[in-house]
């Protein structure tokens, strides 16, 4: 599946996450915002919670916010770093969780030509399918 050019909905997600992160005072604890859209058009946002013993990335916070609101399928997601650092590609853990919980979701990432939308499965080659590891279940 080829990457898609940025859509109006994708730009809306970038704008939403940028607004969220720009509205938070500069902090070592909240440095990334994320926004996602559900298949029914609702937009959800959240921020990471950094702590030295670990904490959720912004994308994972958004998954929880969306689930709490009853969203069952997210179609697109983006993460924006603070201090003008812009779009971040999801980390490996987030890629795996996104692929497991929302198969087919597209992440907005930066390409050579600017932002583009890419299926998360393409960002995580040879994806681990935990539900297919029958020897472990």
From Swiss-Prot:
Q: What Gene Ontology cellular component terms go with this record?
A: cytosol
Q: What is its EC number?
A: 3.5.4.23
| Residues at the catalytic site | 59 (proton donor)
Molecular functions per Gene Ontology: blasticidin-S deaminase activity; cytidine deaminase activity; identical protein binding; zinc ion binding
What keywords are assigned to this protein? Antibiotic resistance, Hydrolase, Metal-binding, Zinc
Residues in domain CMP/dCMP-type deaminase? 1-131
What does the record give as cofactor?
Zn(2+)
Taken from the record, one Pfam family name reads dCMP_cyt_deam_1
**Annotated substrate binding sites:** 31, 85, 128, 130
Q: Which residues bind Zn(2+)?
A: 57, 91, 94
Its quaternary organisation is: Homotetramer.
What's this protein's function? Answer: Catalyzes the deamination of the cytosine moiety of the antibiotics blasticidin S, cytomycin and acetylblasticidin S.
Name of the protein in its database record: Blasticidin-S deaminase
What is the organism field in this record?
Coccidioides immitis (strain RS)
């Amino acid at each position: 599946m080829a990457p898609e050019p940025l859509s109006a909905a994708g730009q809306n997600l970038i704008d939403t996450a940028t607004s969220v992160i720009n509205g938070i005072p500069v902090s070592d604890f909240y440095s990334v915002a994320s926004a996602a859209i559900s298949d029914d058009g609702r937009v959800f946002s959240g921020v990471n919670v950094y702590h030295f013993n670990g904490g959720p990335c912004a994308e994972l916070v958004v998954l929880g916010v969306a689930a709490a609101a009853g969203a069952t399928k997210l179609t697109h997601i983006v993460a924006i770093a603070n201090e003008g650092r812009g779009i971040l590609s999801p980390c490996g853990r987030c890629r795996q969780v996104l692929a497991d919980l929302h198969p087919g979701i597209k992440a907005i990432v930066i390409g050579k030509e600017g932002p583009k939308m890419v299926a998360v499965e393409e960002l995580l080659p040879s994806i681990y399918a935990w539900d297919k590891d029958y020897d472990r279940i």
